[in-house]
Amino acid sequence: MVQSCSAYGCKNRYDKDKPVSFHKFPLTRPSLCKQWEAAVRRKNFKPTKYSSICSEHFTPDCFKRECNNKLLKENAVPTIFLYIEPHEKKEELEPQEQLPSPSPPTSQVDAAVGLLMPPLQTPDNLSVFCDHNYTVEDTMHQRKRILHLEQQVEKLRKKLKTAQQRCRRQERQLEKLKEVVHFQREKDDASERGYVILPNDYFEIVEVPA
């Protein structure tokens, strides 16, 4: 007799080529056997000596490692089951009445004045129109702000250029002063006496002791 799994909905049958083992109900241990029966959850099911459950309904810790996971531990209980509830008849839903889709607003002619009137603003297209206005206003505000920032940058650039020119002039003046000081030192070192040049109305050079 080919062994098959007694679990509800399980179609596993013994096949030597498949790594599925089958385990008999522990009929000699009534308390443990009742736990197996409760786990199977089959109404009016009474296991016999031929009844068995396949290894797919046991967790790995239920097996003895030294036996290559082929033998169950003494108190192992199957706990992995897929319970399928009986199919209930689905209530047929009445088809919902489809509401006519709103037609887009169209321009109308006013019979009193004979002029083409703009389409009526419904809540939907009104919100779109308002959003569009907000977008345009935001864009204009951003453009003005960018223009203002560009003007400030240009002013700062001009100030920086002026400051750089002033700095270069001061550097040139400093270099000239350094040259004068250097020349004066060389002149003082070369002569043993110092002279003071008086204005031209003195018409002479007064010698001053060094």
Curated annotation (Swiss-Prot):
GO terms for cellular component: nucleus; PML body. Keywords: Cell cycle, Coiled coil, DNA-binding, Metal-binding, Nucleus, Transcription, Transcription regulation, Zinc, Zinc-finger. A motif (HCFC1-binding motif (HBM)) lies at residues 131-134. The keyword Cell cycle applies. Interacts with PAWR. Component of a THAP1/THAP3-HCFC1-OGT complex that contains, either THAP1 or THAP3, HCFC1 and OGT. Interacts with OGT. Interacts (via the HBM) with HCFC1 (via the Kelch-repeat domain); the interaction recruits HCFC1 to the RRM1 promoter. Belongs to the THAP1 family. This is THAP domain-containing protein 1. It comes from Rattus norvegicus (Rat).
